Amino acid sequence: MRLTSIAVSMVLAALAGAARAGSEDEVKAVFAKFVAAQNAHDLKAVGDLLQGSPQFLWITRGAPIWGRDAALKRFEALYQGTWSLDPKTDEMKVVELQPNVAQLYVPVTFMIAPAGQTAQPARFLLNQVLVKTDAGWKISSILPIPAAQP
C-alpha cells in the first residue's frame, strides 16, 4: 500500500511538472505572437492577446493605462512613429504564480520615436502577467521597467 502511494505521488508530481512545462511553452508562444503583432503594428492581433477587462493594466512612461481599449488607443498612437521591440529570448523566464497565472520576464530593446524623428534604443526589463482563460492565455498586465545602461 505504501509503495502504491509513493508511485501515485511520483506520477502526480511528474504530471504537474509536465503541465508547468506545457504552460511555460504556451506563455512563451503568446509572447512571440505579441512581439510579432507589435512589430507589425497590428492592433487587432495585439488586442486579441490582451485580456478584455477594465482591470488590464499597462504602465507606460510612469503612467497607468487601465483597460484593453485604452491600451489599444495608446498603441495606435505609438504606431504612427517608430515602435518595435527586440526581446532577448535567451534570458526569458516564465514563473507560474498559481495554476493558470504566469509571470513572464524578458529584457527587451525598444526602438521608439514619434513620426519623422530618429528612434533611439531604450532597454527595459519587461514583465507581463498572463492569465489562462477559456480562449487561451491572455496578457493581463504589461510592466516595463527601465534597465540600467551597460
What are these regions (language model features)?
Residues 123-150:
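Short beta-strand edge/turn micro-motifs at domain boundaries
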Residues 25, 43-97, 121:
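A solvent-exposed, acidic/Ser-Thr-rich amphipathic alpha-helical stretch
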Residues 82, 110-120, 148:
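Short, cysteine-centered beta-strand-loop-beta hairpins and adjacent loop/turn segments enriched
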Residues 11-12, 16-49, 150:
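Short, low-complexity N-terminal intrinsically disordered segments enriched in polar/charged residues
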Residues 100-110:
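A short hydrophobic beta-strand element
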Residues 87-89, 105-107, 120-127:
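Short, surface-exposed coil-to-beta transition loops
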Residues 1-8:
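Bacterial N-terminal signal peptides that target proteins for export
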Residues 94-102, 130-136:
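A short, structured loop/turn motif at beta-sheet edges
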